[in-house]
Amino acid sequence: MPANAFNGFTDYGIGIGLRVPHYNHILSEKPTVDWFEIISENFMCDGGRPLKVLDQILEQYRVVQHGVSAYFGSAEPLNREHLKKLKRLVLRTNTPWLTDHLCWGSVDGRYTHDLLPVPYTFAAARVAAAKIRQARDFLEVPIAVENVSSYAEFHVSEMTEWEFLSEVVERADCGILLDVNNIYVSSRNHGFDPVEYIDHVPAGRVAQFHIAGHTRFRKYILDTHDHPVIDPVWQLYERALRRTGPTATLLEWDARIPSFAEVHHEALKARRFLEKVAVHA
């Protein structure tokens, strides 16, 4: 069944991030996986092993692109060279939708290579929405933006993070990649109620979920993607699914990566929540 009515996104089931340590296992064993998510920037090249592996993956699996450097929240214009390379990859993968983060990370052509939070103001929402529309029109593929984990806030913010996310996606007429772990991490770092966040996101625009693990330090939590998903995050995920219906879900595991079997097993834990929601849909 459709994940929701927005932009014709469909439920792809449960996906896994395509990572280098698993290349050989996937190509040789051809495990049963609903889809793979790739980091777009890792494949925006003219040749080499990454593209060769990607082409082999595309012969067997569905692939969705996830970006880390569009920087829709930066004040400067979109990087046209980046968009051109991204479009070549879009045509190669035939990705049904494309995701990137609602953040900033560039100033005057210099890049932090980080996903930094934006001030939650109406002016910032207008800038981000305009850039999302421009990217979508150029790439000719639906776009969904992801909420980032954050460790600092701006005094000038005029609304909550979930209100800002809603404002941006309504203005841009785009989808949401709802990262449930990021909501949990930010809620613990900033002291807001993650349930309130889940309950106020426009459910009809949620095109995809991210779930992941994190690391707890003495005074804060860091979104490290190097542990299994904890129970409170699964509970938030289930609550979100009750609002969205069955929706494409992706497990991220990017550091201290275990065997493919262990990552796959962790991802498949989402199935019981998807099936429970499907029964009542």
Predicted regions mapped to residue ranges:
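N-terminal pre-domain/capping segments
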Residues: M1-R88
